[in-house]
Design a protein with these regions (language model features):
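Conserved small/polar residues in nucleotide/adenosyl-binding loops
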Residues: 124-130
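Glycine-rich, often proline-containing surface loops adjacent to acidic residues and nearby aromatics
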Residues: 112-123
Length: 131
């Protein structure tokens, strides 16, 4: 199947498909008569899997390790879940800081007292429920 067909079947751009090939995540065969790439059903399924894992924030390097069998998908998902939980915590702290600052009357750069907000959020962070 041609790359145009792969684009239609996966919803990905030509450049994404080529990037996955360049990164050795897929290796389509070549048509001997013209040298064009010939993508298989298996290539399309792998592209879909790779794209899905990317939406979960899993790196190309980690996906390569999964495909090569160096790590399992389960191990990678567990590690990614920890990373996402940490990012959620950091984002919640940033959100709390923004809300605290927005609650102030006429906040400005000149009046910004960083220690006041960081201390308040650090204390609040310790009392946040974890999920």
């Amino acid at each position: 199947m041609k790359i145009k067909d792969v684009e239609e079947r996966t919803g990905l751009s030509r450049s994404n498909v080529r990037f996955y090939e360049k990164e050795k995540l897929i290796e389509p065969s070549r048509n001997e008569s013209n040298g064009y790439r010939d993508y298989s059903e298996n290539d399309v399924e792998n592209i879909k899997k790779i794209a899905y894992l990317r939406t979960l924030g899993i790196s190309i390097e980690d996906i390569r390790s999964i495909i090569s069998g160096k790590v399992t998908l389960q191990e990678t998902l567990e590690r990614q879940n920890e990373i996402l939980n940490s990012q959620i915590t950091d984002l919640n702290k940033a959100k709390l800081m923004c809300e605290k600052m927005l609650g102030e009357e006429s906040i400005s750069y000149e009046k910004l007292q960083v220690e006041q907000y960081v201390t308040a959020v650090s204390y609040t962070h310790l009392t946040l429920p974890t999920t």
